[in-house]
Amino acid sequence: MSESDLWLLPDGVEELLPPEATRIEELRRQLLDLYHSWGYEMIVPPLLEFLDSLLIGVGRDLELEMFKVTDQLTGRLMGIRADMTPQVARIDSRRSHDVASRFCYIGSVLRTKSPSMFSSRTPIQTGCELYGVVGSAADIEIISLMLETLNLAKISPLHMDIAHVGVYQAILAEAKLSKIQSEELFEALRRKAIPEVDEIAATIPDKAIRQKVMALPRLAGGKEKMKEARKIFAGNPDIEYALDEMSQVAAVIGERYPEVEIYFDFCEMRGYKYYTGLVFAAYTEGLGQAVAKGGRYDEVGRDFGRGRPAMGFSVDLKALYRMGKREWAQPAGAILAPNGQDAELWELIRQLRRSNRVIQLMPGEEAGHWASHCDRQIVRDESGQWIVKPLTEFNPNHVK
């Protein structure tokens, strides 16, 4: 391996350097403060667990994205987390009470492949999850908190897609397609490939059901599309219930956040195997994928012995920072301190570090390198006392 190869990082793997790392950390702290103000408790799941635990519920769709290692102590397979939701489900299942549980988390996850060419395989996943609450109130709270997260990062303009897996499930039950046809329809709808959807629909004998299937990729849009959907799907109570949920959530979110454009999408197939109700995703200009997404996944903790209603969202902290339009303030200048073991100098440095950055030179270190980082310096005055002076009066002979 050449020396240059030693410096290379794998594709999709990156490191954070100043000042980006400092700003991302500041954003992380502000997000935790936001979640705390909403009553969400922070949890820190482990980076790796036994594979079986990570593949529970939501995790099974993530198996191909998960790095696997062998535990040298037990010989069992372990996985490095690719998503934190299965871990949160395990944590919630260990709680004995039946009241609502609100969790938030921020931590690195690792994926074998990136969802897109420009996305990271090592995102810093940030999210909130609400357990134990049935109904639209939980959906509205989680979506509101997601939008507050994006607002804090100054991401705009925003538009949000709202979907409901109950619509597709109900139509699939009516159509009575074979397993192969169902899989083909799923893929065609996911890609919004209208000709392929029409071709599959043509095999359905019942005209009314055939028209419902054909309508799915043509119903993406605003309020007018919801009105059209109600006419097309009238008479199916499961679909009508799903449409009511979508409309109720959209109405409240639209009133709270009028600047966010809301669309209904009946072809949103993301997470179809584990989502059980409303699903949503937020988008912004310049990013070809959702900047934040989530949905309802009731009973996700059933395999842990305690299935409960669950709703949540997640976002990549690094994407939040990079897509945001925040104007970051320049850090305050540091104080340059000379090298030395003088007791009075050390006491002054300790006091100053309670509210300032103080950089003390090492033996033989040149002061000039740090001059651009500092706006003040510690020097001795004429009486021999250590004092702080503006760096405009910088004299390298005073700080050695």
UniProtKB/Swiss-Prot annotation:
Family: Belongs to the class-II aminoacyl-tRNA synthetase family. HisZ subfamily.
Organism expressing this protein natively: Hahella chejuensis (strain KCTC 2396)
Pathway: Amino-acid biosynthesis; L-histidine biosynthesis; L-histidine from 5-phospho-alpha-D-ribose 1-diphosphate: step 1/9
Family annotation (InterPro entries): aa-tRNA-synth_II/BPL/LPL (IPR045864), HisRS-like_core (IPR041715), HisRS/HisZ (IPR004516), HisZ (IPR004517)
Protein name: ATP phosphoribosyltransferase regulatory subunit
Subcellular location(s) of the protein: Cytoplasm
GO CC annotation, single: cytoplasm
Chain's role: Required for the first step of histidine biosynthesis. May allow the feedback regulation of ATP phosphoribosyltransferase activity by histidine.
Assigned keywords, A-Z: Amino-acid biosynthesis, Cytoplasm, Histidine biosynthesis
